[in-house]
Amino acid sequence: MSEQNNTEMAFQIQRIYTKDISFEAPNAPQVFQQEWQPEVKLDLDTASSQLADDIYEVVLRVTVTASLGEETAFLCEVQQGGIFTVGGIEGTQLAHCLGAYCPNILFPYARECITSLVSRGTFPQLNLAPVNFDALFMNYLQQQTEGEGAAQHQDA
């Protein structure tokens, strides 16, 4: 048997924590006098770093911007972090775990934090829909592959 077959996958959540929070309502109180028909923009980003053998930090950054016309009603950003033990996998499987599986675990915590901040700002309730991090990760891989193909084509 090869050594790879003897290695079992290990996954454990060590800690989930809020790394950074920001809430701004730059046009308050004037924005409260307007009819609430906001345009809501959601931006997501993930980053991961290896802390030790098989131990990784994954940070999910969720930014929500609500605008009324040209004015920003509020801007809310949460960086939700997690420390995970991930062993027995490498390459694309590890990248998928850190880029999709772990952010999927972190998102409900970030969503709850954003909902709470928006509510404390006395804005109407904001319900963020679930995010398909697997699809986002697959799109990212496809863009990377297309980018490499274009770079190789230019070098030829």
From Swiss-Prot:
Mind telling me what this protein is named? Protein-export protein SecB
Q: SUPFAM superfamilies attached here?
A: SecB-like (SSF54611)
Family the UniProt entry places it in: Belongs to the SecB family.
Q: Which PANTHER family match?
A: PROTEIN-EXPORT PROTEIN SECB, PTHR36918
Q: Name one Pfam family in it.
A: SecB
What parts of the sequence cross the membrane? none
Which UniProt keyword terms apply here?
Answer: Chaperone, Cytoplasm, Protein transport, Translocation, Transport
A Gene Ontology molecular function term for this protein is: unfolded protein binding
